[in-house]
C-alpha cells in the first residue's frame, strides 16, 4: 500500500493544527521561614497584593507584604506541617466568600465555610471580600427607622437604616446584649441580620447562637465566627466577610443589619499580624493604617438611592474600653468614623440601671431624621428632663431643703429612669414604647411609687390590648399622635390606674 506524499503532509498538517497543548504554568515559591501564622516566601516574583496562595498542606494564604526579595504571607488556617523549603503556589485570584440566602440560619468561619455541622452551603454567588464602598451619588440620606426594641435607644438615640452606630463601654456592661436585643427586635421587619464574633470565647458565641435560636432569630441571621483560638489572620478577615454578605442583601433591594463584636479585638489581631510582618508600629504599637482598617469597613454600610433599589446596610460596631477611657486610640478612631455612639457605663450597670446607657454621652447624629413622629412627640423633652434630673440629683446631695418645683423634677426624673429600665432579651414594639413614655413624660406616673413602675408597665400593655386595642393599631398606622389619640390614651391610662393600682 502506497501513500502519496501530499496525503501524508495534509494528515501531518491537520494533526499539527488540531494539537492541543494543555500546559498549565504554575508559579511557585519556597518558604524561607514560618512562625506565628506568617510565612516568608521567596520566588513569587509576579504576585499581587492581597492575592491568594496555596501551601503544600492545603492551607490557603494571603499575600500582604511585597518586599524586594520575599513575600510576607498570612496563613488562613492552622499552618500545621509547614516547614522551611516547602513549596507555595500562586492561585492568581483574590479572596472570595459565598453570599446569598443559602447562608441564612448558618454559623460560618471567616472564609464562609460552615462550622455548625449542618452540611455544606450551596451558594450561587461568590463576592470579593475587599470591595470599594459606594460613592456619594449611590447613597441616600438615612430616613427610615431601625427599631432596636430598647426604650432608651429608640427614644433618645434613635438609629436609622443605613447608619453606623457605635456601642461602646467597658467589659461586662451589656454591649452584646444591646446588639442581640436589636437582632431579636428585627423579627418580622424584613431585615437580615449578621452577627460577626471576633476573638470571642467559643462558649460566649455558642451562648449568643442559643439565645438567637430561642427567640426564633436564627431564621433571618447569619453568624460569622473567628474565635479566640483562630489565627489572627482569620480574626482580621471576619468583619470583611460579614460585610460582604450584608452587601449582597443591600444591593438586592433588601435591608440588612451587621454587628461587629468587637472591633477592639479586631484591631489587636491586625496589630499582631502587622508586627509579625515587621511593619513599623505607631501609637499604642498599632500600625499606621489602623484607622483605614476600620474606616474602609464601616464606610461599606450605607443606604442606597431609589435607582439602586433603596436597600440598606446598618452597622453596629462594638468597642470595649479600659476603665471608661473613651480617649484611647481605637475608641477615638471609631467614634470619628461612626454616626453616633451609645455609651454604656459600669457604674450605672452596677447600680441596677440596665441597659446602662449614659444618656448624656450617647448621641445619634443622623437617626433623628429616621425617628417616627409619635416617638418624637412623646420623647421630645426626655433628654433635657433627664439631664436636669442628674444635675439636681448631684445638687440635692448637699442641699437639705429643696423648693417644690425642684422636688417634683427630682421625683419625675426618678420615675423616668425607672421607666427606661428593661430586662435583657425582651425588646418592646414601638407602639408600646410610645404608650409608656407618654405616661411618663405627661406626668401620669407622678403619683405612682417608684417601686410600682414595673408593675404599671407589666399591666398597661395587656390592659390596652384587651380594652382599647384601637390605640396600638392607630399608633402603628398613623405613626403620630393627634389630639384625639392623646385623649384616648390619657383616658385609658387613668382607667387602668383607677382599677388596677
Swiss-Prot record:
Q: Which reaction does it catalyse?
A: ATP + H2O + 4 H(+)(in) = ADP + phosphate + 5 H(+)(out)
Main location per the UniProt record: membrane
List, alphabetically, the GO terms of the cellular component aspect.
Answer: plasma membrane; proton-transporting ATP synthase complex
Question: How would you describe this protein's topology in the membrane?
Answer: Peripheral membrane protein
Q: Which Pfam families match?
A: ATP-synt_ab, ATP-synt_ab_C, ATP-synt_ab_N
Q: Please tell me where ATP binds in this chain.
A: 169-176
Give the location in the cell: Cell inner membrane
CDD domains from the xrefs?
ATP-synt_F1_alpha_C, ATP-synt_F1_alpha_N, F1-ATPase_alpha_CD
Q: Which PROSITE patterns match?
A: ATPASE_ALPHA_BETA
Keyword entries, A-Z: ATP synthesis, ATP-binding, Cell inner membrane, Cell membrane, CF(1), Hydrogen ion transport, Ion transport, Membrane, Nucleotide-binding, Translocase, Transport
What EC number(s) would the UniProt record show?
Answer: 7.1.2.2
Please name the top-level EC class of this enzyme: translocase
Q: Name one GO molecular function term.
A: ATP binding
Site described as Required for activity, positions?
A: 362
- Please explain the role this protein plays, according to its UniProt record: Produces ATP from ADP in the presence of a proton gradient across the membrane. The alpha chain is a regulatory subunit.
What protein family is recorded? Answer: Belongs to the ATPase alpha/beta chains family.
Q: How does it assemble?
A: F-type ATPases have 2 components, CF(1) - the catalytic core - and CF(0) - the membrane proton channel. CF(1) has five subunits: alpha(3), beta(3), gamma(1), delta(1), epsilon(1). CF(0) has three main subunits: a(1), b(2) and c(9-12). The alpha and beta chains form an alternating ring which encloses part of the gamma chain. CF(1) is attached to CF(0) by a central stalk formed by the gamma and epsilon chains, while a peripheral stalk is formed by the delta and b chains.
Q: What is this protein called?
A: ATP synthase subunit alpha
Q: Which organism is it from?
A: Campylobacter jejuni subsp. jejuni serotype O:23/36 (strain 81-176)
The organism that produces this protein has a lineage beginning with:
Bacteria, Pseudomonadati, Campylobacterota, Epsilonproteobacteria, Campylobacterales
Task: Quote the gene name from the UniProt entry.
Answer: atpA
